[in-house]
Design a protein with these regions (language model features):
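Short catalytic/ligand-binding loop motif for oxyanion handling, primarily in non-cytosolic enzymes
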Residues: 54-55, 105-108, 156-160, 206-207
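Amphipathic alpha-helical repeat scaffolds
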Residues: 77, 97-104
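Short amphipathic alpha-helix with an adjacent loop that forms part of the alpha/beta core around
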Residues: 75-95
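Mobile active-site "lid"/loop adjacent to the S-adenosyl-L-methionine
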Residues: 107-129
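Conserved Class I SAM-dependent methyltransferase catalytic core
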Residues: 126-183, 197-198
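Flexible, glycine-/basic-rich loop-and-beta segments that form/coincide
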Residues: 190-246
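C-terminal target-recognition/interaction regions appended to catalytic cores
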Residues: 245-343
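Class I S-adenosyl-L-methionine
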Residues: 1-80, 317, 324-343
């Protein structure tokens, strides 16, 4: 069951990113945290605590706050002038931040019909981002906890453009441990990967994330460096200035989840299309067939670019384009070791 605060409308829940965390995910988060930290000597703080799922454990000192005055907690906007004294925490107090901070990408197409881009509450300029969750991560860095153990979309880390937005955070914290879980506990459709992430003081760069081995709730692991990606071979976005002789048109691409929703080849040109040159046509045909199998691969690939084994594809490209069985065998090998639903 998807749980949201009963006193909020559906639109308010989406705009505030307000979805309660199932107890089993809270348990997973604390299991991850306790594997590395003796938490008894730390104050626990959840700055967007909702119904305080992360604060129901027995603990010497735990503090909950939320922007929603109807929550039974301190009424504090965590994104306006964040500082420890707002929460009654001293500067030298050992601190761990926990929780499931709101996330709501205003630029995403998901639930765009009910998102209100004019929905405003105060956010400090250095914390502003297109996604509330990224703003929260940056606010945590200002409070200087020893550890941070929170849920957030995996895309914050694995999409390089998102990762760059985390500068204030990534310059002061590094990923220590993680578990990738499905968003299906929070949304009925458009399943995407969420990470229960444990951070410690330090710093990280995108190369660290590419090397990181993410355990998943499917008893598998995900490592970005294990794969090659179609973006290394074709344009994903409108490219009129780069392509002279054009043999076709393609819908702009984001990630695998977007490919599931969107068209591939287009009949007519426009300002917002990818133009295809003859030498790149086979790769766009590859993407077209990848779309067919995309719903059959595990959810945790959803925010990655389209995956390709370039050498293996070129070896069988003619058979791949003509023979469904050849394509199926190729994709089985590409995703070997992952729980797919191929025929």
């Amino acid at each position: 069951m998807i749980r949201t605060p009963k006193h909020l409308t559906k639109q308010e829940s989406v705009n505030l990113g307000a979805y309660y965390t199932p107890p089993y995910l809270v348990d997973c988060a604390y299991k991850l945290l306790k594997k590395h930290v003796g938490i008894e000597n730390y104050t626990l703080l959840d700055t967007a605590c909702g119904n305080k799922e992360f604060l129901k454990l027995h603990h010497p000192k735990k503090i909950g706050a939320d922007i929603d005055p109807k929550c039974d907690a301190l009424t504090i906007n965590a994104l306006a002038n964040p500082k420890r004294e707002n929460y009654g925490i001293s500067q030298d107090e050992p601190l761990i931040i926990v929780g499931n901070p709101p996330y709501n990408d205003r630029t995403s197409f998901i639930k765009q019909d009910i998102k209100n881009k004019d929905f405003i509450f105060e956010i400090d300029n250095d914390l502003k981002s297109r996604d509330l969750g990224i703003s929260f991560l940056k606010s945590f860095a200002i409070l200087k906890p020893a550890f941070i153990c929170v849920l957030h979309p995996l895309s914050y880390l694995i999409k390089e453009a998102n990762f760059k937005q985390l500068k204030l955070f990534k310059d002061h914290y590094r990923l220590l441990d993680a578990l990738v879980v499905s968003s299906k506990s929070f949304t009925k459709s458009n399943e995407f990967p969420i990470v229960i992430a444990l951070y410690e003081r330090g710093r990280m760069d995108y190369a660290d994330i590419r090397r990181f081995i993410f355990p998943t709730d499917c008893d598998t692991t995900l490592c970005l460096n294990d794969f090659d990606y179609i973006a290394n071979y074709v344009d994903k976005y409108p490219n009129a200035k780069k392509v002279g002789a054009c043999v076709g048109y393609f819908f702009p691409m984001r990630d695998i989840n977007a490919l599931k929703r969107n068209k591939t080849f287009l009949n007519a040109p426009s300002a917002n299309v990818v133009r295809i040159s003859q030498d790149k046509l086979i790769y766009y045909q590859y993407i077209h067939y990848f779309k067919e199998i995309a719903p059959k691969i595990p959810y945790y690939f959803g925010n990655l670019d389209i995956i390709i084994d370039h050498f293996a594809f070129l070896e069988i490209k003619d058979a791949f384009l003509k023979d469904k069985r050849a394509r199926l065998e190729y994709f089985k090998k590409l995703f070997q070791g992952h729980p797919c639903e191929f025929d």
